[in-house]
Amino acid sequence: MQAQKSYDLAGKSIFIALPAYDFKVSLKLAVSLARFAQAAPQHGIDIQIGSICGCSVVSRARNLLVQDLLESPCDYLMFIDSDINFEPDDILRLMAWGSDPKKGIVAGVPRTRSETKTYIANLEYDENGELTMNGMGLVRAERVATAFMLVRREVFEQMIEAHPEWKYYDKKTDRMIPCLFDFQLTEEGYMGEDYLFCDRAREIGFEVWVDPSISLGHMGVQEYMGDYGRDVLYPMIAPSVKDVA
């Protein structure tokens, strides 16, 4: 599916959120962003870009970027980690999928920076042990990494409304910041801020979906090119898929 042909994205706006602890992004990411910035106006999309640099606590950086989104008029927040490479159409696809109000989180699945093809996502299975797809390629998930994640603005707004006690005063920026991304000890062990955020979004009624057709590069000493569909999903899909509208 070509998102720009199947959905009308005109008038939509997106906040590109870049947490970059070491004040730099990969050259490939810079080129990807430039290409998306060229493509977006052709689809009537407005862009804002925000970054938090030098913050060693990634959950704080993400929360600050959420507040930046909320102070903007943008419809979506797009988290992109500083070591992720993508194609401009990948963001257009996620925006198209995210036009469904139920799909609060839609993401590509990054590969870890290792020779083993390990991916950072937990898919959702029903009571019969079957996966759920939307009939157009998306797969429902329980949790996914924030490395390349689109979030509807309403997810943040409704989470804050449900939990006003999560706001805290950030002295450095002199603002009240929603603590939506956090680390937590659970029965499963130590849970990172990305998985906990997905749990919190699902608790207030939003769905989490992943697009296995998106191939992301993950930069390290070398580029670890991922293909979640080919490596993980498609080999297991035939006996364990249930389509939903």
Q: Could you describe each region identified by the protein language model?
A:
Residues 1-56:
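N-proximal low-complexity "stem/linker" segments adjacent to membrane-targeting elements
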Residues 1-11, 15, 163-245:
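C-terminal catalytic/acceptor-binding lobe
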Residues 73-85:
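Short beta-strand-to-loop acidic/aromatic patch adjacent to the donor-nucleotide binding site
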Residues 76, 103-105, 208:
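Short, Asp-centered acidic motifs that coordinate Mg2+ and/or phosphate
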Residues 66, 87-182:
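Conserved catalytic core of nucleotide-sugar-dependent glycosyltransferases
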Residues 32-35, 64, 93:
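Alpha-helical elements of Rossmann-like donor-binding domains used by nucleotide-donor carbohydrate transfer enzymes
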Residues 63-76:
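Active-site nucleotide-sugar/metal-binding loop of Leloir-type enzymes
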Residues 58-62, 194:
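Conserved donor sugar-nucleotide recognition element shared by glycan-biosynthetic enzymes
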